[in-house]
Structure formats: structure tokens, C-alpha cells
Amino acid sequence: MASPAFMRFLPRCGAAAAFGTLLGLAGCQSWLDDRYADSLPPTSGVQPIKGLAQNVSIRRNALGMPLIETGTFHDALFALGYVHASDRLSQMVSLRLLAQGRLAEMVGPGALEIDRFMRTVNLRQAAEIQYRNASPRLQRFFEVYARGVNAYLYRYRDKLPMDLAQSGYRPEYWKPEDSALVFALLNFGLAVNLQEEIASLTLAQKVGSDKLAWLTPTYPDENLPFDEAEKLKGLRLDGQVPGLAGVEGAARQVAALSMLGVAASNNWAIAPQRSRSGKSLMANDTHLPLSMPSVWNYVQIRSPKYQAAGVSIAGLPGVVAGFNGKLAWGMTMVLGDNQDLYLEQLRRQGNRLYYLADGKWQPTRERQETFFIKGQRPIREVIHETRHGPLLNSALGERKNILQPLPLKSGYGLAYRSIQQEADKTLDGFFDLSRAKTIEQAFDATREIRAMPLNIVFADEKHIGWQVTGRYPNRKEGRGLLPSPGWDGRYDWDGYADPILHPSDQDPQQGWLGTANHRTVQPGYGAQLSNSWYYPERAERIAQLAGASKSHDTQSMIRMQYDQTSLFVAKLQAMFDNPGMALPLRQAIDALPEAQRSRAREAYDRLMAFDGKLTASSSDAALYGAFLHESARQIFLDELGPEDGPAWKAFVETANLSYSAQADHLLGRDDSPFWDDTRTPQKEDKPAILARSLAAAVEFCEQRLGSERKAWQWGKLHTYEWQSDSSKMAPYLGAGERAGLGAIKGYLDRGPYPAGGDHTTLDVSAYGWGQDFDTWLIPAMRLIVDFGQSEPMIGVNSSGQSGNPASPHYADGIDAWLKGRYVSFPFQPQNLDRVYGNKRLTLTPAR
């Protein structure tokens, strides 16, 4: 996320890159490696460090993943902070600035709208509450970790990674509260329905509240939410929500930085009766936006009172998901809806802003915020809050100059209510989970986790378990799927669901447990967990594969994690073949002009014969992907366009978040008003639009991939491309800085690579349905624990261990991830040398 001022060295390096000659580019990269070689910490030798009690050993495996060996837990936490800073300093600094709403201090005015959005959300308050309510023990852990981070910062303050060095920003020392802030940011990223609610207002402005329910389905077997959309009926939304475009734009920017609205992850546990060894297995792969580096980094810690291996997040002390020698644990998002947007009626009287609450006008609370901006003078702005929370559009909106304050006047405000002000022991719960040795201890630990809505699956040698965590509001009326009228107390919250209603299970008779962001409870369940479930196909595939064998082992877990079969294909084929559709569809195809008719018949025949395997080399998968793309556009673009307009962007983005109108219309909704093409005089129906889409899919492949059918490949349309945090910030930089980034794109970024799968496959590879085929969501890490093995845990990351482009471990993890080359994390002392070797960096207590 850093903003490198690369123009300093462009005279030497950028010209060769701009001309694109291989020799010049290679020379540029070599020069950059040499220029920033001293920003890489040593991997051997001895370093005296103040703050340690005893010597610490740090060894690294072939991919640079560290093994930290210490004599005390204090030193383990200190060393983890030191290692995180050495591997991911730029990432840590960027996460902290994003959470604080201070990116503009490093990036400049282009990040100011992001900062305004984040200041309004006020994660600092959430972090303070979490940290203040953590146990004294946990606070000490955070303090020791921070001292480790700062020991590295002090030692290498003049040898910063390229992006930080060129930005001119000097990182502040790490505070214990900063780790709570990173946690609050990651938790905020689980707020999928926040983006959906913002998008729903944009869509309602385009099509009206009467049609909105058709665009916001909740699940294949549930009725459309017409009752929920009724809340918005009669409200004049068009032009009456000042700053809505600014709010949506800022939320989109935060999401693009991997920190908002990600429907993420698979996990499952196999009971002993279904395993080859007669012992449990657990697998987890967390889905996050393609990024360089990954949010995750692997670490193994060995100390007398704490052993664990797994994934960690730079900025947080501990192992988030992994294995501790006795217990394995992994997590997915519930997609819990624990926030709401409220439309507030506003009016300005004199210098005060008022909002309507149950028939009375109340003054908003005002919060002053000062923004420091690189290259500009500071600005001071007011953020308004109502009884429901901060007004997201009080600081965001159209203004003549981005640096000018925004005077919010009459119209509707967007108040954001969340659970982030609630106090609990969530931070302690995560640490206790990493130390749990049995299923019973794991259940005890997960019940402490109230701030974050997760499906946590865990296993010991003989047992498996699942627990839903979080805090879920009881709504007096409404479902919270769409924004509610804030002036009407009927839509307020009434406490939270009793934790006893949080779903859980242990050792089920079926012999497995698994979650994939799907609906895990039946409609009408006593606690309203969500209305924003993800597509069900990944969960259905887990059930299909987990229940198909009684001899599961490590290899079957790997096959499941890399499985690219989509069950949506069979559902699409069943829809085509339905008695009520088969004949009308054939008639609609026959009614097409000759050229389109032959293409539509070809597409129909091939899709009906398709086996559903979305491999990168598959020709039929390319045609299938083209059909999904064209059908979305044929059904919806006439009313939601143009393509670059806010409504279409909002529509495509919501399909990334949860079960979508695109899928819902393909599998049903024959009576939807969106089947009619408003651009033509006649009234189209579903068969007519499907026939057009079939023909258009073949034409699309011909135009993009050529007329030779054998040359069609899904991976030629659908690709992975790893972008650095610096590259992701490029749209918010000045023209000169963007040119500098472009000149060294090959140094910072990787790809494209052919991709298989899509949003419905276990090997997830999601893209903008109806927009393009660029993969944005992947399994950012994979881990497997097989208690039947002498060394149970293996794992693989999606990028390199280091976030420093000068490091040999910046991108070496990509090839391992693409090819499924997992790394072992041994717990038996005699196996450590085999994986980590004998080369070590020794940290010693400084005198």
C-alpha cells in the first residue's frame, strides 16, 4: 500500500523499463536488488538485541519460513515481533495507517477519501475497547511483541525496504495497541453486508425499490426479500443521499486494498472413522484477494511452554490457524451480519446538524478529526454521529476541491451501526485456542471469541468439532439486509442473540464437518446470523467428497483443496433440461438468425455435455465461463448499465460478496422483470435471453480466442496476477509516481498465469461476473493436519514469505502454490534439521 516516489531513480532505471527491452528490464531489477540489499536482514550470524532474556535461534526453510526456538515464551513473542518486522515491515506500516485513517501521510491527497472513510468508521475506538478489556496477561504479550518489532525498527531504521524508503515516510515505533488496531481492521474486513447495503442504495436509485429484491436474493431455496425492500418504498432516494457515490467509492477502495468484504474460505475436519489411519484430519484454506505479499505468513514457534506452527499476520502476536502438536484448528467466515446502515433524515439549523429520531429532531454528536497529508497542509473536519453511529457520508461526497471540508446539509445521512463498541475477551480467546490441547479446551476458548463471526473447525487425534463465534444483533423488525429508516425505532436492535444459540457440533455421525461461507442453519433459526450467505456449491462439494470415502488421508485432502469441479454446471444443465424450459429454449434458438442459431446450438450441445471440471486447459470451461459472462450482461446490462456506471459496478461487486442475482436468475426466477430487454420493442422472456446468451458465448470465444475450438482454454481468459501493495495504490498517486511504478511493474508484480476454477469450486478463483475474468480471490494459504502422520502438518502460502522485492523469498512461494508443493512443519526434534537446516540467526541479549 505504500506510495514509492520512484521518480528519484527513474533516470537511471526507468527508461530501460519503459522501452521494455529484456536486457534493460533485467538490468533495472538487478540494480534495484543491489540498491536495497542492505534492507534484507541476515539469516545467519549473531545479533545482540536489548530486551531478550536468553538466546533465540531463527532458522528458515527453503521458502524462508521461520522456525523460532527460544527458552522462554517471553523471548518467543519478542522474536516473533522481530521476525514479522524483518519480513513484512511495509505491510505492517500500511495496515496500521489504513486502520488509523492516515494513509495520506505516506501516499498524499489521493488516499484522503480512504482516510475519511476509515476515520468515520473509527476503528481506533474498537481497538481501544478490545485492548482495554483484554486480560493483563494478554496485554503483556502485546507489549513484548511490540518491543520485538521496535528492536528491528531501531536497528534497521536507515535500511528500510524500497517502498518505505522511497516514500519518505518514517515509520513510527510499534505500540501494543497497534496490534489491536490491526485486529480491528481485519475484523472490519468481514463486514460483507456493509458493502451490500451501500450497493443496494445505488441499485435502488437506478431501478427503484420495487425491483430491488430481484437483485438481492439471499439463497437458492429462499423467497426474494420483498418484505425487506418494503422499508425503502416511497423514499425519494435519487439524489437525496449526499455523498453516496463517495461512500461507495471509498468502500470500493478499501476493498481493493484487501480489507473489506471478502467472502472467504473452506475448512473441514474428517473423523477417525473416515480416515485411512483411524485418526482425525483437518484442512483449511482461507480465501483472500490476490496480493503481493499475502496477508498470511507462516511461522513455527518452539518454546518450553508454547509450541505452534501455522499462519500468522504481521502485526499480531501468535498463530491464527494451525497446529500445536495436539490440536489443529482453522476458520472460515460466517458472513455474519452484525452491522446495519440506517438512513437518517437530516436538516441543518444554524451551525448544527439535526436528525429525526422517533418524531423529534436531535443534534448530531460532533467529532473533530485532523488529516495530515503528504505535500499539503493539514485539514480539520467534522464527523457527525447519530444514536445509531457515525454518518458515513458526513465526511465523504462531492466537493470542488478534495482538500475542502464537506458541509453536510439536508437529505439522508448514512449511519453505521456495528458491534465494535462491545467489550469482550476475544483477543484472549484466540490465544487460548492456540494453546488448547483437546476439543473440550478448544470449545471453551472459542466461546470467548465474540467480536469476530467465524466458523472455527478443530480436531485432535480422536475428535472433531465446529463452533460459530461472534455476536449477532436481535432486530426488532426487519432483517438488516438493506438499509433501514433510522427515524423509526421499530428497526433498532434489541440486544444480541444468546451465545447458546451459536451453532456448534462435535463428532457427528456422518464422520465429517465442513464450512464454506454457506448457510449453516435453516431459515427461521433462533439467531439471525446473516442474510448474505455465499453460493452453496463449495459446501456441497465438501459434503460430496468428504462423505464419499472412509480412507481419507493427506493426499485426499490435497486433492480436495485443489479440486476445480463446479457443481453449478450440473444445476445449469438441469435448468436447460427442465420440462418447462427444454422446448421453449429450443424454439428460441430456432428463432435466432442463422449465424446466431448455429452458435447457440453449438454452445448448448457442448454445455450439456460438459463435465464441470474448470481446468485451465479446458475448452468447454472457456465456453462455460463465456456463457456466464454473456448471460449476466444480456439479462441485466440494459437496465443497470452503462458498464462504467455506478449501478453496474455495484451489481458486479455484490456478486463477489454473496449469492447473486446472476446465479439466481439462471437457476430460476422465470417471472423476473429483468428478462425483458428494455432496448427492444418486443418483450423478451427467459428462453429468448438464454438463447441469445448461448450464441453470444461462442462469438465471445471466437473474438477473444480465435475460431479454432481446440485453441480455446479457460486459462487464456481466466488468469492470476499478483500485484504488490504499491501497485494497488497506483490509482491514488500522482501521474509521475504512477509512471515510476509502471516502469518497474515487472519487479514488483508477478503474472499473469493461467487459472482454473471459479467462485463455486473448492480451488476458488473468483472474478467479476459480467465484468472480466481477472482472478481477484484465491486460497491465500492452505494447511492440512493429518494425525495419522508422524509429522502431521503441511502447508503452502500464496506468495513469498517476504514483502521486500529485493528478497529471494518475495515471490518463490507462488510456484509452490500453483503446483501444490506443500511444506512440512515438523514437531519432532530429529526432523527439524531436515526441513530447516543448520544455518541460523542467533539473537543474544545485549549487555
Curated annotation (Swiss-Prot):
Its main location: periplasm. The keyword Signal applies. It is found in: Periplasm. The active site is at S265 (nucleophile). It is an enzyme of class 3 (hydrolase). Heterodimer of an alpha subunit and a beta subunit processed from the same precursor. One of its GO terms (cellular component) is periplasmic space. InterPro entries: Ntn_hydrolases_N, Pen/GL7ACA/AHL_acylase, Penicillin_amidase_A-knob, Penicillin_amidase_dom1, Penicillin_amidase_N_B-knob, S45. GO terms for molecular function: hydrolase activity, acting on carbon-nitrogen (but not peptide) bonds, in linear amides. It holds the Pfam family Penicil_amidase. AHL-mediated signaling mediates quorum sensing in many species of Proteobacteria, regulating hundreds of genes, including many that code for extracellular virulence factors. One of its GO terms (biological process) is quorum sensing. Its EC number is 3.5.1.97. It catalyses: an N-acyl-L-homoserine lactone + H2O = L-homoserine lactone + a carboxylate. Belongs to the peptidase S45 family. Keywords: Hydrolase, Periplasm, Quorum sensing, Signal, Zymogen. Residues 1-26 form the signal peptide. Catalyzes the deacylation of acyl-homoserine lactone (AHL or acyl-HSL), releasing homoserine lactone (HSL) and the corresponding fatty acid. Possesses a specificity for the degradation of long-chain acyl-HSLs (side chains of seven or more carbons in length). Appears to be the acyl-HSL acylase that underlies the ability of P.aeruginosa to degrade and utilize certain acyl-HSLs as growth nutrients, including one of its own quorum signals, 3-oxo-C12-HSL. Is thought to have a role in quorum quenching. This is Acyl-homoserine lactone acylase QuiP.
